[in-house]
Amino acid sequence: MVYSKYMWSVKGYENQKLFLDNAFVNNKLAHAYLFTGSDRETKKQLAIEFATMILGVSEEEKERINPDLIVIDQSKMKIEEMRALISELSLKPFRYQKKVAIIQNFEDVTDEAASSILKTLEEPNNSSLIILLSRNQKSLLPTIVSRCQSIYFNIHFILLIFNCW
C-alpha cells in the first residue's frame, strides 16, 4: 500500500489522503471539492487539514485565527450568508496564496443558497478553493456535484478495517 506524504492526524482513508496529496504536490488542485459520506467528523478534520496544507500553515500557526480559512458549520445556511461568503472569497487572500472555504452539511443549505454558489463554482476564482461536506451527493443539485471533485468517505469501510485487527 502507498501512504500519504503529508502527516495527517486522521487515521484511515489512505486512498483519499493520497489523492489529495498528489493533487497538492503536482499543483493539480481542483477549485472545488465535495467530500461525501456518513463520517461527518472525519470529513471535517480532513477538510481542515487539507486546507492548512494548501495554505502552507505551519504547526505553530494552526491554533491561531486564520482569515484565509473560512469554516462554516451551521444548518440551513441562507442565501444572504452564502452571498457574504461568495463576496469574501472574491477578495484577495490576507496572508496566503489562496482563501479556502469549508461548508459543512451542504445538503442542508437552502435551495436559494445552493443556487447562488453555482456561478462561483462555474467561474472559479484562482485565489479561492471551496470544500463542500455532505452526507450524500444525491441530495445536492447535479450541477453543483458536476463542478466539484468528489471524494467519498465511507465509515463502514474504516470500521471493517478496525474490526479486522
Predicted regions and their residues:
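P-loop/Walker A NTP-binding region and its immediately flanking N-terminal helices
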Residues: 1-103, 129-131, 142
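Short glycine/proline-centered loop/turn elements that form peptide/ligand docking sites
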Residues: 78, 115, 135-137
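Conserved adenine-binding aromatic site and its adjacent loop/helix in ATP-hydrolyzing domains
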Residues: 87, 119, 146
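Conserved catalytic/switch belt of AAA+ P-loop NTPases
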Residues: 90, 115-132
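Conserved Walker B
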Residues: 105-109, 137
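Conserved D-loop-proximal element of ABC-family nucleotide-binding domains
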Residues: 111-112, 142
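Long, charge-dense, solvent-exposed interaction surfaces that engage phosphate-rich ligands
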Residues: 129-135, 139-165
